[in-house]
């Protein structure tokens, strides 16, 4: 190699040293000084791994003094390069800069600079980079982004709600599905969409204390969202790191009690600038016009400050009208400010519901009915649609569907309230009751008599509660020596049932924690039955361990013994056998108990076993629940109302179960009331709301589309290619499971999302749902998203050299494959990628500027190429640098047309979509007050910013491949 003192060279193997200067040489060696690090390197002159740094006209270079020069001309004087051009800071022209005075800290980031500097990547990395660009761009444009990556069943009504709400600006909605329909999943899907799109970055979830850890685990396991759990200890600890402890984390879970207990803490929560607030079990927030509870006021303060709010609550029927109004008031106090007015509005929606029922029935409509529809929708140009809906034409059903959609848009609370019922959602199992009447032991009879004498002054309610749990009465008298489990026939029955069903998982629920603990000891000591215990005295982590042990198939516990808290929030639908060792005091708690197994996704009919003692309050209550309310075998939305009306009579029968006169009449009366209320509820069902929440055929198609995307073979091929190149070990374990572990030669020391001890992955949704230890890999999984970022944010694969063996072309023919990226820069929350994601434009240019990309597909072409080692590649590039530079100039002139077309299409699409959305909502605003002014303002502002950002969109060269034709 011809070396001269003062020349600038770069190391092919240690590019981080920056620019080197020739400072010494002899016949065999040359010494380079790298001023940016102060290090010297001695190389053999004949075959040194260094590349001469030479810039070309059009490049911009930096002097050692920091000013920049745009090169117009390159001269050579005595073997040294002199650059002539315009100085950018002073705009002085004809300025010279000798290569020896170049900035030594020069980093080559442009693909062409890296190529000419000898920083040549492996060919497979170039291919991976192009695929990453292509797939990332496609994924940004795929419908249902944010709904495909969660580890959940594809249940249409859940997807429908999440798809509707997740795309909104700062959604403020009430999720009020019946128990077992998956409100937590819906909330998680909405969060996942908002976070993935950039619409939200900071999220606060407030839940009852008993559900904190469950939410933490669900968000991580199902949605790959890592929340931080804040309690007193974590809050105090975080105060050392920031004035506002909640600003130390982006995603936070805390309990309602934690939030409202301390005034300063609540202020910190309010000041933490959350984008989304989620409140679970919101029906526990007590409100009345005169005396709202502290919990309600705490959430109200937060809801006033946080743009997006999701409230998860019981159904409106269970809540009652006033409580339901209180929830809506949290979402939009301006819209829901007058309770009486709200009640009146609800009555006025009946004609709309009737109209929907009319359309859904599919019968021909009378002129009066057509006129009524026209009045309700209130648009001048609706006549053709009405005629089509009432005709025998092929488009009649489509017209009816559109009319239903228009009615839903214009009336009711359907934009702020989502409520699915079991009637409208298929797929629930049957519930079968098995009662077991057992004799009352003499020990209990004696204890009950004594208790009656000693507790004569107790209220009927207290006596009733005592009578439900005779083992507690007995234990109270006998103290520590009382071993009720030795004679209670329910214990013998339970042991017999469990031993005869060893292979089945059984959930046992009892009211008291002490009962659960005592039963565990008896089952373990007498029969060796593996039983986990779950009660309020355990820490959250201990409860999780107990639940996980119960969930294990082979080595797990056969039975989980829960106190009453076990029937709130925890789901065990992998089990189908429920034993109620005793009965809860009200029908809501009964439904909660059954609801732990009776959930969507339950594969078997639920067997409900109730062993009860005759002549006790248990025998009274089991009859009342079953015969009076039908509450065991069906959900009972009327339960609370009937319980309240029959309370006094029921309490008396429970307090004195031997007094049975009139009890049959009470049961008959309650059953009649139940049937009447049920019919009334059915008649008054908000069909409009149910149709909107359920999604119908549209939701079915949504689930089907996502299921089809699950079968994307491109993902598997890309992921394996990515893991290979990053350096992640892959061990195929069979059954569609692969174990990933870090290696010692990874591109980065710590790959984001890959634990130190590795992880198990699967590309199959069914496998992920059955194996909690396996992560479900989709395009939305952090491993894939982080992998894409790792490749595309750096220069991996941005320059390479290949040989093309093709005897149809002359030896030495040059081709340059260019990958440009057309993109726009904008804040993430604008979601610009919907319209113009970073989009690759591939060119394959020959020496004359002919673009062959359309004739030669990338993967086909890539398979015909062979690799060149870096040293040989550098020599090839240096030999034809001027030719390659000329081809690059031709590429720059050709890319503009393609890029402009992409940008113009994106602007047109963005303007049409956002203007259309704004116009639609503005039109609806006149007839539906549930559309918020701030939502309209946000869409308008978003539209203007998106269009402005697209006006400033540009393009850049992202990667290039230099190809030389050979015949060998």
Swiss-Prot record:
Entry's EC annotation: 3.6.4.-
Domain Helicase C-terminal: residue ranges: 490-685
InterPro entries in the cross-refs: Helicase_ATP-bd (IPR014001), Helicase_C-like (IPR001650), Helicase_RapA (IPR023949), P-loop_NTPase (IPR027417), RapA_C (IPR022737), SNF2-like_sf (IPR038718), SNF2/RAD54-like_C (IPR049730), SNF2_N (IPR000330)
Ranges where the Helicase ATP-binding domain occurs: 164-334
Presence of the UniProt keyword Metal-binding in the record: no
Placement of sequence motif DEAH box: 280-283
UniProt GO MF annotations: ATP binding; DNA binding; helicase activity; hydrolase activity, acting on acid anhydrides
GO-annotated biological processes: regulation of DNA-templated transcription
Record flagged with keyword Magnesium: no
Keywords recorded for this protein, A-Z: Activator, ATP-binding, DNA-binding, Helicase, Hydrolase, Nucleotide-binding, Transcription, Transcription regulation
Chain residues that bind ATP: 177-184
Top EC class for this record: hydrolase
Subunit structure, interactors included: Interacts with the RNAP. Has a higher affinity for the core RNAP than for the holoenzyme. Its ATPase activity is stimulated by binding to RNAP.
Job description of the protein: Transcription regulator that activates transcription by stimulating RNA polymerase (RNAP) recycling in case of stress conditions such as supercoiled DNA or high salt concentrations. Probably acts by releasing the RNAP, when it is trapped or immobilized on tightly supercoiled DNA. Does not activate transcription on linear DNA. Probably not involved in DNA repair.
Family: Belongs to the SNF2/RAD54 helicase family. RapA subfamily.
Protein name as catalogued: RNA polymerase-associated protein RapA
Annotated organism of origin: Salmonella paratyphi A (strain AKU_12601)
């Amino acid at each position: 190699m011809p070396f001269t003192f003062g020349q600038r060279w770069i190391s092919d193997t240690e590019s981080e040293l920056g620019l080197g200067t020739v400072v010494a040489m002899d016949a065999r060696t040359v010494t380079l000084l790298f001023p940016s690090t102060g290090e010297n390197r001695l190389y053999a002159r004949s075959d040194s791994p260094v590349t001469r740094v030479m810039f070309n006209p059009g490049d911009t270079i930096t002097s050692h003094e920091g000013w920049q020069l745009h090169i117009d001309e390159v001269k050579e004087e005595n073997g040294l390069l002199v650059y002539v051009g315009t100085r950018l800071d002073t705009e002085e022209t004809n300025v010279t800069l000798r290569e020896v005075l170049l900035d030594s800290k020069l980093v080559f980031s442009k693909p062409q600079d890296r190529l000419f500097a000898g920083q040549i990547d492996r060919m497979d990395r170039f291919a991976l980079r192009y695929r990453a660009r292509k797939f990332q761009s496609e994924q940004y444009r795929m419908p249902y982004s944010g709904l495909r990556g969660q580890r959940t069943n594809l249940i249409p009504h859940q997807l429908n709600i999440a798809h509707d709400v997740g795309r909104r600006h700062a959604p403020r909605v009430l999720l009020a599905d019946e128990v077992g329909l998956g409100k937590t999943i819906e909330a998680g899907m909405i969060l996942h969409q908002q976070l993935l799109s950039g619409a939200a970055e900071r999220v606060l979830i407030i839940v009852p204390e008993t559900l904190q850890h469950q939410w933490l685990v669900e968000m991580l396991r199902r949605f790959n969202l890592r929340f931080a759990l804040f309690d007193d200890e974590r809050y105090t600890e975080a105060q050392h790191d920031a004035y506002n402890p909640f600003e130390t984390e982006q995603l936070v879970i805390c309990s309602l009690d934690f939030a409202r207990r301390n005034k300063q803490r609540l202020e910190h929560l309010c000041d933490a600038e959350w984008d989304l607030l989620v409140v679970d079990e919101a029906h526990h927030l007590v409100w009345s016009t005169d005396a709202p509870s502290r919990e309600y006021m705490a959430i109200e303060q937060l809801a006033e400050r946080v743009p997006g709010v999701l409230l998860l609550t019981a159904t409106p029927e269970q809540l009652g009208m006033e409580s339901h109004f209180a929830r809506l008031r949290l979402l939009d106090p301006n819209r829901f400010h007058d309770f009486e007015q709200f009640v009146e509005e609800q009555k006025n929606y009946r004609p709309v519901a009737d109209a929907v029922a009319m359309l859904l029935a599919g019968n021909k409509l009378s002129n009066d009915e057509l006129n009524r529809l026209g009045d309700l929708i209130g648009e001048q140009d609706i006549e053709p649609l009405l005629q089509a809906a009432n005709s025998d034409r092929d488009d009649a059903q489509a017209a009816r569907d559109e009319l239903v959609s228009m009615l839903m848009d214009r009336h009711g609370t359907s934009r702020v309230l989502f409520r699915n019922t079991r009637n409208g959602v298929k797929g629930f199992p049957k519930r079968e009751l098995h009662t077991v009447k057992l004799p009352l032991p003499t020990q209990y009879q004696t204890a009950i008599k004594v208790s009656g004498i000693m507790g004569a002054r107790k209220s009927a309610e207290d006596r009733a509660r005592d009578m439900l749990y005779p083992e507690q009465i007995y234990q109270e008298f006998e103290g520590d020596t009382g071993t009720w489990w030795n004679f209670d026939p329910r214990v013998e029955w339970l042991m017999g049932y469990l031993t005869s069903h060893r292979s089945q998982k059984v959930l046992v629920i009892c009211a008291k924690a002490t009962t659960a603990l005592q039963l565990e000891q008896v089952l373990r000591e007498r029969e060796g039955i593996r039983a986990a215990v779950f009660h309020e005295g355990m820490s959250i982590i201990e409860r999780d361990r107990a639940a996980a042990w119960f969930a294990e198939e082979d080595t797990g516990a056969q039975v989980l013994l829960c106190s009453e808290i076990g029937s709130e929030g925890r789901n065990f639908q992998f089990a189908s056998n429920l034993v109620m060792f005793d009965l809860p005091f009200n029908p809501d708690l009964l439904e909660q108990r059954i609801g732990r197994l009776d959930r969507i996704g339950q594969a078997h009919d639920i067997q409900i076993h109730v062993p009860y003692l005759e002549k006790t309050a248990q025998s009274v209550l089991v009859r009342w629940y079953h015969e009076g309310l039908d509450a065991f075998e069906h959900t009972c939305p009327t339960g609370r109302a009937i319980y309240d009306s029959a309370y006094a009579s029921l309490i008396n029968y429970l307090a004195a179960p031997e007094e049975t006169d009139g009890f049959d009449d009470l049961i008959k009366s309650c059953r009649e009331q139940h049937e009447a209320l049920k019919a009334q509820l059915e008649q008054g069902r908000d069909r409009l709301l149910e149709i909107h929440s359920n999604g119908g055929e549209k939701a079915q198609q949504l689930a089907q589309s996502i299921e089809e995307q699950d079968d994307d073979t491109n993902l598997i091929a890309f992921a394996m290619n990515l893991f290979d190149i990053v350096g992640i070990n892959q061990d195929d374990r069979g059954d569609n499971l692969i174990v990933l572990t870090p290696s010692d030669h990874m591109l980065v020391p710590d790959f984001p999302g890959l634990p130190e001890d590795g992880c198990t992955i699967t590309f199959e949704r069914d496998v992920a749902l059955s194996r909690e230890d396996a992560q479900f890999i989709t395009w939305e999984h952090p491993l894939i998203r982080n992998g894409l970022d790792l490749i595309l944010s750096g220069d991996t694969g941005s320059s390479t050299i290949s040989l093309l063996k093709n005897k149809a072309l002359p030896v030495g023919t040059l081709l340059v494959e260019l990958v440009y990226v057309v993109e726009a820069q904008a804040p993430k929350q604008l979601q610009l990628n919907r319209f113009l994601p970073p989009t690759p434009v591939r060119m394959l240019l020959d020496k004359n500027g002919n673009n062959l990309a359309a004739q030669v597909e990338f993967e086909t072409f890539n398979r015909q190429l062979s690799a060149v080692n870096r040293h040989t590649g550098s020599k090839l590039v240096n030999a034809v640098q001027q030719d390659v530079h000329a081809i690059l100039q031709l590429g720059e002139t050709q890319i503009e047309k393609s890029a402009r077309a992409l940008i113009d299409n994106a602007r047109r699409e963005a303007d049409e979509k956002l203007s259309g959305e704004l116009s639609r909502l503005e039109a609806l605003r006149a007839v539906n007050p549930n559309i918020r002014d701030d939502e309209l303002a946000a869409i308008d502002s978003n539209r203007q910013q998106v269009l402005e950002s697209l006006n400033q969109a540009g393009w850049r060269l992202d990667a290039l491949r230099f190809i030389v034709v050979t015949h060998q």
